């Protein structure tokens, strides 16, 4: 997680603050929110996920939400498409650390599966 945070911080500093027109240059769609933490239905379920086609490809619905944020600068989903800037990155990362702790507490089975995959590989 620390490497991921450092990468985001480096990106924010490379891109810098919004330019004179105030438009955000770098948006973050990886934060913990209702899209990125959508519950996975049981394997034998016929229920389709709204935001994901599979684990690494977002659905067209998520893609349209991204485009809406990029074009309007406004997100209807909390913490989706944050503007990463040198002046705001620390607050975003602190919020994300707390959100991750909360997600882990709500999803112990998913956390155990992820940890197992990280230790033993796919």
Regions found by a protein language model. Give the residues of each.
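Extracellular glycan-modifying ectodomains
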Residues: 1-122
